[in-house]
Every structure is written in structure tokens, then in C-alpha cells.
Amino acid sequence: LPTETKVTSDIIKSNIIIGQLEKQTLDKYQLQNCNKLMIVAHPDDESLWGGGHLLDKGYFVVCLTNGNNTVRRSEFYAALKEYGCQGLMLSYPDLEGGKRSDWSKYTVKIVQDLELLLTYKKWDLIATHNPKGEYGHIQHRMTSQLVTDVYRYAYKGMNRLFYFGKYYKWNELPKVQNSLIPLSESKLERKTQIINTVYKSQDVKWDRHMMKYENWISFQAWRE
């Protein structure tokens, strides 16, 4: 389970290192009636793990990577338009030297960006990857860790952080299926349509068995 560290606290209090995000950028958005924040590692994560929720609107979605990738940036903003939500992309690396980045060189900047996001206003709900990174993706786990650390610092005593639901492999799903609440048929159909028509650069077939489930778990419940 992620725990708040002194390092995170020191980073938040520091005014020396600046991340990629500035308050002036957030000021350009109309966030008065936008009370829910979703933070994801990659474009399409917002749809795979939270598309049904996004259809309820009212979300500001922040993607940490691929802001410099023309195709993936275009797909991300097209998806948000379909959901009727606002959002932005940062440009932390997905890959470095052909390998998946562990973000070790960028942690300080990411934490500062997250602190700005979480304290820009008091969000009613904050959603992000779960501590296991769904199927174990290192950048999903890192996103969860850093968001949780900043949340603990900025939202003490509150119950506003939610993790994406637990991931189950194909052969595991039948054992737990009865305990999961599926999306409504209309939401699943619309979510699937958006993913299929917008994210043409990505192959998400291997995650299809989890598409109908978005059983988010509160920070408190995950700890129990």
C-alpha cells in the first residue's frame, strides 16, 4: 500500500523545481462545474478503466504521458469530446530508448504537477490507477503511488480518492463475476463505440473481458 513519504512532502513544499503544468494553464479551462478529477498514465486508460464513469460527465481528465505524440494526443482529445469532458495531456515519457520508462528522472516534477492539480480546487472525487497497476503496468503503479502520496498530504481526513477496479485475467473472471457490478448495456455500448472509433492506433482486445466492469474502490476500502 502506498504511504506518504517525507520526500513527497518536501517536494510539495519546494518552489525550486517546476513541473510541466502551471496554474495559468488550468485557469484557461472552465472548471467551475467540473468537480471530479481523473489522472491516468496513458491515453485510452481513461476509457478502459473509467469510460462508463466519464459518460456521467463532470470530469477533468489528466494524462501524464504522450503529450508530444501527435496521434495519441489527437485520439485522447477526441475521446474526451465524445464523453463531454475536459482534460489535458502532459509529456512525461512512455518509452525511453525503446524501453518503458520508470520515470525515475521525472518523479519530482510529476509530484509537483499532481500537487497543483489536487490543490487547484477541492475536488469531490479523484480517480486514478489502483496500487497494483491493474494488470501490473509499472507506470500505472507509479501513477497510483504518486497520486496517493499527494492526496494524503492535501486531503487529510477526507474520503475522495478512488482506485480503478481490480483486474482479473480471463480464467479468473468466472470465479468473481457474480460479485462484480457490470455497466448498463447502454453505457457499455457507448464506451465500446468510443474506444473502437477513436483509439484506432491501439490494440485493446486483450482487455475486452474487463470492459463491462468499472468497480472502483475507495482509498479506505483498498486499505482494509
Where are these regions (language model features)?
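Active-site rim/loop-helix segments in enzyme catalytic domains that contact anionic ligands
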Residues: 2-121, 149-156
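Histidine-centered active-site/metal-ligand motif
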Residues: 42, 129, 137-140, 198
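A short acidic (Asp/Glu
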Residues: 48-51, 135-142, 174
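A structural signal for short, well-ordered beta-strand segments and their strand-loop junctions
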Residues: 63, 89, 125-129, 159-165
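Short, solvent-exposed loop/turn segments at secondary-structure junctions
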Residues: 66-68, 94-95, 132-134, 167-169
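Proline-aspartate-enriched helix->loop->beta-strand connector
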Residues: 115-118, 122-132, 140-143
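Catalytic domains of cell-wall/extracellular-matrix polysaccharide-remodeling enzymes
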Residues: 131, 135-152, 158-160
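The feature marks non-catalytic terminal segments
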Residues: 154-224
